[in-house]
Amino acid sequence: MGDRTEEEIRPLPLNSYTEAVDWINGLLPFGIRPGLERIELMMERLGHPERRLKFIHVAGTNGKGSSCAFLTRTLRECGYHVGTYTSPYITKFTNRFQYDEVDIPETALLELANRVVPLVEEIAGTDLGSPTMFEVSTAIAILYFAEICYPDVVVWETGLGGRMDVTNIVTPIVSLITNIGYDHMDVLGDTIEQIAAEKAGIIKAGVPVVSCVEQPEAITVLKTTAASKHATLYLMGEQFHYERLSVDAKEQQLHFKGPFRDMDFTIRMLGGHQCKNAAGVMMVLEVLRQYMAFQLEDEQMQDGFRTTFWAGRLEVIREEPRLVLDGAHNPEGAASLAQSLPEAFPYRKLHLMMGMLANKHHQGYLKHILPIVDTLILTEPDFRRKMDAEALYELVAELQGTEAKADLEIIVERDWRKALSLLESRTEREDLGVVTGTLYLISDVRAALLHQTDSEKGW
């Protein structure tokens, strides 16, 4: 058999899928450190696998996940093989890395994790410090797509911001900036202009960019950045428009008007914000069809939009009592939720269970959601950065006199399982129960209601 090399004889550092996920998650204490030096070094050491892939880069405060779902489903329906990289995940760590809407096999994740362990250890010993959990996940995603499954295109979601986000290591064929709002202000800045500048950081020289951004100050930032990069900008309200034709509890119909043609289509994702997301995605697909020779037939595109589903976004998880899950976690998300609930679901009383993370814009969120709530159940997600339920109650109490219904009932229950039981018992036949505030809470509640035993939930 011949002599084996020392490398072949050396035992693998990780021996199971669980060990691999634990190792990756164990990198979390190094935190979110914006900067591309570590991922650039990793890509260099791996032979630049990212250069062998075509990416659609998606950034934005809200709507990234839903937009990625629309893109993936519709491109699949049109016959393309699609890689998808998203975060956070709802059920399992493998949800982050999908090929043709199927999670990465646990064996492949283990193999790729073992591949990058020595690299991570090497970089950890330099002045750059250890790669973070998100950097390692991103490297694994690139290796999976470039060396194992070879998709025609990769739908590529930013983790945080854009300019200094790890995913910005790639040069895409088209970029999408869904919208801009107040989130992660500790990292991205506390004005719309500052946040817009971070998101606009994904705009690359000569690469077309689509956006549904609406604030005038954000539009100015995008136009300036795109012009400086000689990147064609397709802006909702200027280069493309949409009209909502109808809406009910099952679906919405839209009319899209773009620079190349018009089209009517239907989506089953609920809420007015999903119409904007869908219109932005339709514009991205039109760019691919018009300039990059993608073969996208009308009927297949319409089928793709109509069949797109994304867990935890105005998701009816149970009919009796009627319970809805929604991952809204910032003021803009709360505004969309407050508008969408009465529109999509007729109800007598609204009972809302919420838990949030500590680093969110809590008052802005509450101002949007409190006016429509009859019973508010405050709880805590099972996550290290959770907001204390009593502290959340104090914020609600400050706003109660001016923002809430006069007879609002507030319950504080730290244990989310007990809070869920309370929500179920309060929600009568004509009522609506909603769980919201963070995807980390949604994930646990969803797993409990669907009796999923393999839920891992997390970043």
Q: Whereabouts are the PLM-identified features?
A:
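Short functional linear segments
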Residues: 1-60, 67-78, 85, 121-128
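Buried hydrophobic packing segments
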Residues: 71, 75, 138-145, 280-288, ...
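ATP-dependent carboxylate-amine ligase catalytic core
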Residues: 12, 36, 40-44, 48-51, ...
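Nucleotide phosphate-binding/pyrophosphate-handling subdomain across enzymes
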Residues: 52, 148, 153-158, 165-176, ...
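Active-site-proximal loop->helix
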Residues: 88, 92-115, 186-203, 209, ...
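Beta-strand->loop->alpha-helix junctions that form or flank phosphate-binding loops
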Residues: 86, 212-213, 227-247, 267-272, ...
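ATP-dependent carboxylate-amine ligase
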Residues: 2-15, 25, 170-172, 193, ...
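Acidic, Mg2+-coordinating active-site environments of NTP-dependent enzymes
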Residues: 123-126, 150-153, 157, 172-264, ...
